[in-house]
Each structure stands twice: as C-alpha cells, then as structure tokens.
Amino acid sequence: MISDINALKYKKVLLKVSGEALMGDKQFGHEYDVIKKIAGDIKEVINLGVEVAIVVGGGNIYRGINASLVGMDRASADYIGMLATMINALTLQNVMESLNIYTRVLSAIPMMSVCEPYIRRKAKRHMEKKRVVIFAGGTGNPFCTTDSAAVLRAIEMNCDILLKATQVDGVYDSDPKKNPDAKKYFTISYKDVITNSLQVMDTAAIAVARENKLPIRVFSIKEQGNFARVIQDKGEYTTIEE
C-alpha cells in the first residue's frame, strides 16, 4: 500500500458505478454482499490517500429510456430514474458507513430530509475533508444519462480521472459476451469511441470529456481490489483519452 499520496498519479478520482453493478446476479434490486465488496474496494482506495467521489446509476431499479419506449412521457420517466439513483446512493452510503467510511450524499434534485442538495463548493469541501461524496439524481435534468452526470461532476470536482466500473474489463470493438474474438483496447481515443459507436458511454458524455481533457478508465468491478489496482496503472482496463 502506498503511504505517500505524492507517489500516486491520480489523487482525486470519480468512480461511476452502474445500477446493474449493485444487483450482482439478481435481476432487480440490490445484492448486499456485492455492495459491501464494492464499498471495501472504495475503502482500499481511500486508505491510499485518494479523494473519491461517486456517481451511481439507477438501472437496477428503473430505466427511464426503456419506460419511454412503451409510451411513458420521456421526461417523467427520466425523473423516476433519478429517484432510483437516490435509492442506490442511500443504500451505498449506508453500507459504506458500516465500514466506517465517512460519506455524504448530494442530490441534483433537492431532498432535504434525506440528503444535502448538490452545491459544488460544498461537495469540494467534503472531499477535501476526505469524505466520500456520492452524487445522486443524475444531472437533475431529463434526457441526460448518469454517464453524462459522471463526466460533469468529475470536471466540476477537478478530478484527475473518471473510473467507470463495469461488468467487463475494458472497451472492446464488439460485445465480448457475444463475440469470443472481440478485440480489447488498452487505450483508445475519444474520437474513435464516437466514430465506432462503441457502447461504453453515450456520445454526449464522451464529447464533454474530450472537450475538457478528462481521461476515462473502464474496468471490471467484479474482481475484488480492481479499483485500487487500476488507479495505480495495474490490472486490466482501457483508457480513453485524446
């Protein structure tokens, strides 16, 4: 374990955790053993001296875009999806605090009874005090994904890198679950991700990351300890940069 924070390349990071990552092998909801493992991985990174922020998705509970396809108003469906991210954020906070990780949930949609509203300066101050900040509610606007929220929050918090935790160990030229010959990229440019329509993040999120020179690293959250390894340039991952 690195004791000198100055030895680390990335000292402030944002972790994007999908809702699907929280449900493990279930079809819906939460798998608490999986969430506890993720919380343990986060604690390992905190112990390195790294400042950590998190954006959590809501796809394990509700997907606004899917609901809109069957007739629900898209904006209303997206707001319901934002509420799903709040459920996940509070669940993750509870598990993390059981491991003695100081955590604050800040929501883009004010819910004063359960968490703080998102205020950029307050969020940065929490991170300076070594608290983990979980951003809920996406961007607070419909028609925006939680990937876009992750990129925006990473930029606002002046993070060195965005880590996207997924079910696969990087970015491939096709779905490795369907194509055994899929090629994995070690590094790939923002432009190539967009041009090749690679399904790692939505185009808007990649475009904003590119404009602000925010590197993105995609890795698998399924293997314990991967988060700490990846921010130290170890393990399996793909880096998206210029």
Swiss-Prot record:
Q: What is this protein called?
A: Uridylate kinase
Task: From the record, give the transmembrane residue ranges.
Answer: none
What pathway is this protein a component of? Pyrimidine metabolism; CTP biosynthesis via de novo pathway; UDP from UMP (UMPK route): step 1/1
Function summary: Catalyzes the reversible phosphorylation of UMP to UDP.
Where can this protein be found? Cytoplasm
What InterPro entries does UniProt report for this protein, alphabetically? Answer: AceGlu_kinase-like_sf (IPR036393), Asp/Glu/Uridylate_kinase (IPR001048), Uridylate_kinase (IPR011817), Uridylate_kinase_bac (IPR015963)
- Statement: the UniProt record of this protein carries the keyword Signal: no
Binding partners and assembly: Homohexamer.
> Which reaction does this enzyme catalyse, per its entry?
UMP + ATP = UDP + ADP
Native source organism of the sequence: Rickettsia massiliae (strain Mtu5)
